[in-house]
Amino acid sequence: MNNDNTDYVSNESGTLSRLFKLPQHGTTVRTELIAGMTTFLTMVYIVFVNPQILGAAQMDPKVVFVTTCLIAGIGSIAMGIFANLPVALAPAMGLNAFFAFVVVGAMGISWQTGMGAIFWGAVGLFLLTLFRIRYWMISNIPLSLRIGITSGIGLFIALMGLKNTGVIVANKDTLVMIGDLSSHGVLLGILGFFIITVLSSRHFHAAVLVSIVVTSCCGLFFGDVHFSGVYSIPPDISGVIGEVDLSGALTLELAGIIFSFMLINLFDSSGTLIGVTDKAGLIDGNGKFPNMNKALYVDSVSSVAGAFIGTSSVTAYIESTSGVAVGGRTGLTAVVVGVMFLLVMFFSPLVAIVPPYATAGALIFVGVLMTSSLARVNWDDFTESVPAFITTVMMPFTFSITEGIALGFMSYCIMKVCTGRWRDLNLCVVVVAALFALKIILVD
């Protein structure tokens, strides 16, 4: 009997080794399983944060919990099987806040129409991938603008986190002011942030998850939330699947929003794929990684599918580097992550015991990570640093990621032309800047 079990396990391991080419990548099934669990623990916070954010757009948090798990599970498994890369996918932080607080909240657009904008942005990304334009765009967008976009989104997310904790509140004279720091909600939000930063500085991979658990337990103690169980059959999601308003999103008013969703997702996912595969030692001398086109297809198709089932834009997660750090080198790592997300679907009642301040610390911490790239800007060259600065600060100050990107691209062209360095411009930058200028003239 024991011999039969041993043979079965050996055969299963052999199948996985052949399917994911483990020997060629110098890894084992055990290492890939550990790597998958590590990546999952570092990014599972998204199943709590995403429902909180999209809930602000009048979407049912429990349904969003399920769709988040579903798309993260299927997307990660697809990345593992088709591209054989240790990269996990899930709804993107930043774009979910943009959707909920700007597109739906500030602009007053229904979540169904907002999802339509995400859908068309994802379709655009797929077409760019199909016609091999995506890699050309990545290569031709200046580093300063890419950094400005990333950092601006980081500040935007941090602003949402500070607002959710109550650290900052509205003021009619000064726009914002410090909140009531004696409030237990504010104090717990601050506590959650420092739990993440301290644990992360000690290289603890599940820092964000621990912070959410600790502050949620405190929320139970103070009566801010109420325990309603742990396990349940996933709620019906038929009310959101296919509810995207595709025709309503195809308007001039939303053209800039659609373009922003596409552009941000293009930079975010492509940059993450390159970063993770580079850390895994999979990048060749030409800056490309194995199955690059397959990975880009999986990424863009996942975003289309995500909008269709009712969740925000899907992207590759930089947290995948945590799995790579412990030895993950193949798609088996991503498959393990995907399976874990699918299993988590059966724990939707847990969403109800996570108060807003419990996830706020994660938002602020993501802001810290994203703004750290500003150190790479050449601050001595004003034709590079000024557009990066404008892009970064105008996102939170205008409460619009789209406006930040638009002003960044246009200021880049202005600075280069007015300083006589117009030869630094390329077709991609000029076209994007011109499109945004036309949007401002014709629509705004």
UniProtKB/Swiss-Prot annotation:
The keyword Transport applies. Residues 1-29, 83-84, 134-145, 201-204, 281-293, 328-331, 378-382, 419-444 are cytoplasmic. GO terms for cellular component: plasma membrane. Keywords: Cell inner membrane, Cell membrane, Membrane, Transmembrane, Transmembrane helix, Transport. It is found in: Cell inner membrane. It comes from the Bacteria. GO terms for biological process: adenine transport. One of its GO terms (molecular function) is adenine transmembrane transporter activity. Pfam families: Xan_ur_permease. Signal peptide: none annotated. Residues 54-63, 102-113, 167-182, 224-251, 310-311, 347-357 are periplasmic. Residues 383-418 dip into the membrane without crossing it. The chain crosses the membrane at residues 30-53, 64-82, 85-101, 114-133, 146-166, 183-200, 205-223, 252-280, 294-309, 312-327, 332-346, 358-377. Its main location: membrane. It is a multi-pass membrane protein. Belongs to the nucleobase:cation symporter-2 (NCS2) (TC 2.A.40) family. Azg-like subfamily. High-affinity transporter for adenine. This is Adenine permease AdeQ. The gene is adeQ.
